[in-house]
Amino acid sequence: HYAQYHLSNVDLTGALKGALVTARLTSDNVLLKMTTEAEYNLAHSYPDGKVTMDVTQLDLHELGLMPQPMKHPLAFNFSAEARQNRVFTHLVSGDMKLNLSARSGVEPLIRQSTHFVDVLMRQIDEKALDHAELREALPTAILSFSAGKENPLAYFLATQNISYQDASMKFGTAPDWGINGKAAIHTLKVDTLQLDTIFFTVKQDTTSMKLRAGVINGPKNPQFVFRSTLTGEIRSEDAELTVNYVDGKGQTGVLFGVNARPLTEGHGKGNGVLLNLTPAEPVIAYRKFHFVDNSNWIYLHNNMRVYANIDMDSDNG
């Protein structure tokens, strides 16, 4: 029983043939209609098995997990497989797809991921990033996601008065090509607000990691037209971030950034973070400025003291 429901037609079977364990679980009732099959090979020292789950109806509202019903009950197909040199998962629900694959078994993947984190944390402690070393420590894996308007994510967001045209994401890691990926959402509507395109990209080479994100509203947007971007770059010994805003008339409203460089030499040569404001002629609230005599820095000492030398003049007086 679950609440007022009498759950019937639930069946579990299993078998052992040699070293292969198999199991099958089925459910056919008002709350859950599904079939799950799994197998696992006990003969190997590494995880070796797979599972598939086909859910044709799962009512989250009736289960008390959602305050109001969605457009359709939850239905999805999920499969996962772990072999000696491969890990793969696949989820499909309506027009939503999620895939994760790696060119290694479960245990090597965990070891590689842990090693990458250790290398990254050591470099952060040393305040100097070696992107070539970071790339060598990366596991080879790909994560991808895509969704339209007919899937549980869209149905749930609709209950919150949020909608979108489509969403997609693909990120990959490998020693050969580093960390690369992109993500985008088109025609995102929240109540009366509409954002035409939201995007994010990342690309790593042997010397740096470049990041770019932004929001773009095209000429047909019912509210306002603009392009706003964040551009960043993480290099070996410094990082930079710039924000740029251009309105529908092509006029720059904001162009402003900061460069951050750790100073670690000590003995009067620095022990903190030096921030340099960029570019040489920033734009703030549609007004162009310039820094007088290179007065564009802020120094954050590790002893919590702050030193600054900023002098900006506007070209408009």
Residue ranges and their predicted role:
Residues H1-G317:
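Interface amphipathic segments
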